[in-house]
Amino acid sequence: MDRIHLTTQLAVQGDVFRAMLSGLTPDQFRWKPAPEKWCALEIICHLYDEEREDFRARLKSVLETPELPFVKIDPPAWVSERKYMTQDFEGILKRFLTERESSVTWLSGLKDPPWSNAYLHPKVGPVNCDLLLTNRVAHDLHHIRQLNNLRYGYLTSISTVPMDYAGTW
């Protein structure tokens, strides 16, 4: 496992989120392709919460106290409980990027951590550090794809011309 590469990817993907989300208008960051789908505002709120309360917290837990159970989280419930749609888009984006930088700094500063540690999850079995770090990178990629689809969907929703010249989506 190339943990340096994965940590670098987290930094790079933070820059990707910054580039994809900076400068969006309220119409753009609130646009949804369907009522049950997430908009960019909900995605960045989710990423902010996940950065602090899921991946980083759980990786820290497995590294330091693998025998203790994970703190329970409920990301789907957070959307309404934390009123994602009422959040300040630019503010939450800035807070997410600050948290991401903190995560990268923390990971980069670890000195000989016990990467072989694993928490024995009662439902999914062993959850080790490499699984958490790799899935953090994969989670970013999932939401980058989701944001790309949102941006394309928004463009097609406001366009008066066909999009097939650009290629098949």
Task: Show where each model-derived region lies.
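Short amphipathic alpha-helical segments at helix-loop
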Residues: 2, 40, 81-88, 124-128
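Short, contiguous alpha-helical
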Residues: 30-75, 104, 119-169
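Short amphipathic alpha-helical segments, especially helix-boundary/capping motifs
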Residues: 3-4, 16-21, 32-36, 76-81, ...
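Alpha-helical bundle segments that constitute or directly flank the non-heme di-iron/ferroxidase center
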Residues: 1-28, 50-61
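Acidic/histidine-rich alpha-helical segments that form the ligand environment
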Residues: 9, 13, 20, 77-116, ...
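Surface-exposed helix-capping loop/turn segments at secondary-structure junctions
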Residues: 22-29, 108-116, 152-156
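Short acidic/polar alpha-helix capping motifs at helix-coil junctions
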Residues: 6-9, 21-23, 66-69, 79-85, ...
